């Protein structure tokens, strides 16, 4: 059984990253997306790809926490990294109004600029959205999209089935993290039942959000097996079948 973790972050310590990647391989996680979002996260994701170029796909971007930095400098650096590296996606990008609603305008501008970049260079996007459904939908609808097929993935989905349907209609896949295993996450489970097989992805969002039964531990890609097992039971599927379909979906998106 092969598993594709579509969203993992890494630290700066190369030895630790190598060990995390080795444990992932032992657990059957044969591919993953190392995701950036800041100068530090982008550098760490690049390092992960350098350590395991066969297994690691790379997403480079500027997340909502970079929204108050000089926009021209941020976008220039993102363009430079995409020109110099073999990237599979632009990300993570998007909106989070939970902690910093006061930067909503700047977040939307940075989000839109990177959507336009992804369209220009022909890559999918990895989107974060939290307490920003209307704004996310608005930016997605404002930015022209000239590519064919799927536009990207809404990662670590925590919304209702109704918003998931709107995202699916706009050409996105939907990815579920260990949150779906949490006792309080009934709405997330409803969405996980709703998303069709050909749009479903799985992730860790490590080092955060370790799934049950690993809660309280530092998350890592190897733990995605627990989320796969949980989703298979939730969707009344075999574990190996769910791993296979999410792997195929991820390969179609990221290679």
Q: What do these predicted regions represent?
A:
Residues 1-255:
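Mid-domain alpha/beta scaffold segments of enzyme catalytic cores
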